[in-house]
UniProtKB/Swiss-Prot annotation:
A Pfam cross-reference name: Toxin_3
InterPro entries: LCN-type_CS_alpha_beta_dom, Scorpion_toxin-like, Scorpion_toxin-like_sf, Scorpion_toxinL, Scorpion_toxinL/defensin
Name this protein carries in UniProt: Beta-toxin Rc1
Sorted UniProt keywords: Disulfide bond, Ion channel impairing toxin, Neurotoxin, Secreted, Toxin, Voltage-gated sodium channel impairing toxin
A single cellular component GO annotation: extracellular space
Expression sites (tissue/organ): Expressed by the venom gland.
Subcellular location: Secreted
Organism the protein comes from: Rhopalurus crassicauda (Scorpion)
């Protein structure tokens, strides 16, 4: 399933135009531009811990 991975506080994980960073916890991921900045978008989002 695709989506924005979140941290332990429920905040989207931000990135700085670095797809490798986004892919470390997902099947594949990339930096995606949002109104407020950049966040990781992932295919294969891991379940929340």
């Amino acid at each position: 399933k695709g989506g924005y991975p979140v941290d332990s506080k429920g905040c989207k994980i931000s990135c700085v135009i670095n797809n490798e960073y986004c892919s470390r916890d997902c099947t594949s991921g990339y930096c995606y531009f949002l109104r407020w900045g950049l966040a990781c978008w992932c295919d294969g989002v891991p379940p929340q811990r």
